[in-house]
């Protein structure tokens, strides 16, 4: 089962609960809510999280994009938080992201779910599949059995990313040992905030 949004009922402390539930006082989020909030905060820094967007709006954004271009948006299905919309060889398509027990993974049929990797954050999940697609992609050939390959290659940004973030991505692509670089500590801290290549 995936995470469902908890309905807040009543007034006062119960009504003030976060939509993801809290443990203890209204000021102190549960560990689960804190993990989820951290993952969503990280996602909001990417520049390719579009927030609330319909399926048709996502299709419109991706229709002229090259194959492999993707964006993350809020899911229109109440059992899921997020959806990946991606341009495939057959046109734009959507894939839900499942959140369960503090982990994110791609939604799939039950017999395959246990084999799919799980991640602490959505950005880590996307980064993993983008890197995997870079390693395996040899060309845009269509599969022979009628299935469509899902390639994640390039995010569709909501707006031009800040130069600082683009520099951080470039550094992340070149090294995984930020602390060995001859940079000020404050800059190293900034680089450590986002360790991904996408």
From Swiss-Prot:
Biological-process GO terms, alphabetical: cytokine-mediated signaling pathway; intracellular signal transduction; negative regulation of growth hormone receptor signaling pathway; negative regulation of receptor signaling pathway via JAK-STAT; proteasome-mediated ubiquitin-dependent protein catabolic process; protein ubiquitination
Covalent cross-link Glycyl lysine isopeptide (Lys-Gly) (interchain with G-Cter in ubiquitin), where: 173
Region of interest (Disordered), ranges: 6-30
Keyword check for Ubl conjugation: yes
UniProt main location, coarse: cytoplasm
Phosphoserine: modified positions: 30, 52
CDD domains: SH2_SOCS2, SOCS_SOCS2
Subcellular compartments: Cytoplasm
GO molecular function, one term: ubiquitin-like ligase-substrate adaptor activity
Record PTM: Ubiquitinated; mediated by AREL1 and leading to its subsequent proteasomal degradation. Ubiquitination is dependent on its phosphorylation at Ser-52, by PKC. Ubiquitination is stimulated by LPS.
One GO CC term on file: cytoplasm
PANTHER family for the chain: PHOSPHATIDYLINOSITOL 3-KINASE REGULATORY SUBUNIT, SUPPRESSOR OF CYTOKINE SIGNALING 2
Record text about domains: The SOCS box domain mediates the interaction with the Elongin BC complex, an adapter module in different E3 ubiquitin ligase complexes.
Subunit architecture: Substrate-recognition component of the ECS(SOCS2) complex, composed of SOCS2, CUL5, ELOB, ELOC and RNF7/RBX2. Interacts with IGF1R. Interacts with DCUN1D1.
Summary of the function given for this chain in its UniProt record: Substrate-recognition component of a cullin-5-RING E3 ubiquitin-protein ligase complex (ECS complex, also named CRL5 complex), which mediates the ubiquitination and subsequent proteasomal degradation of target proteins, such as EPOR and GHR. Specifically recognizes and binds phosphorylated proteins via its SH2 domain, promoting their ubiquitination. The ECS(SOCS2) complex acts as a key regulator of growth hormone receptor (GHR) levels by mediating ubiquitination and degradation of GHR, following GHR phosphorylation by JAK2.
Protein name: Suppressor of cytokine signaling 2
Source species of the chain: Bos taurus
Underlying gene: SOCS2
């Amino acid at each position: 089962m995936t995470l469902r949004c908890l309905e807040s009922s009543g007034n006062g402390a119960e009504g003030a609960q976060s939509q993801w539930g809290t443990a203890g006082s209204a000021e102190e989020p549960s560990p689960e809510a804190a993990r989820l909030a951290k993952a969503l905060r990280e996602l909001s820094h990417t520049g390719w999280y579009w927030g609330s967007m319909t399926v048709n709006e996502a299709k419109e954004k991706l229709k002229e994009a090259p194959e492999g271009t993707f964006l993350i948006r809020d899911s229109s299905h109440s059992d899921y938080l997020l959806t990946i919309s991606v341009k495939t060889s057959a046109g734009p398509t959507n894939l839900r992201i499942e959140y369960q027990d503090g982990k994110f993974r791609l939604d799939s049929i039950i017999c395959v779910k246990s084999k799919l990797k799980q991640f602490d954050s959505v950005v880590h999940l996307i980064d993993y599949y983008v890197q995997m697609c870079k390693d395996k992609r040899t060309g845009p050939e269509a599969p022979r059995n009628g299935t469509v390959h899902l390639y994640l290659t390039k995010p569709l940004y909501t707006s031009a990313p800040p130069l600082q973030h683009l520099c951080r991505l470039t550094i992340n692509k070149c090294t995984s040992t930020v602390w060995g670089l001859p940079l000020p500590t404050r800059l190293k801290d900034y680089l450590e905030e986002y360790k991904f290549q996408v």
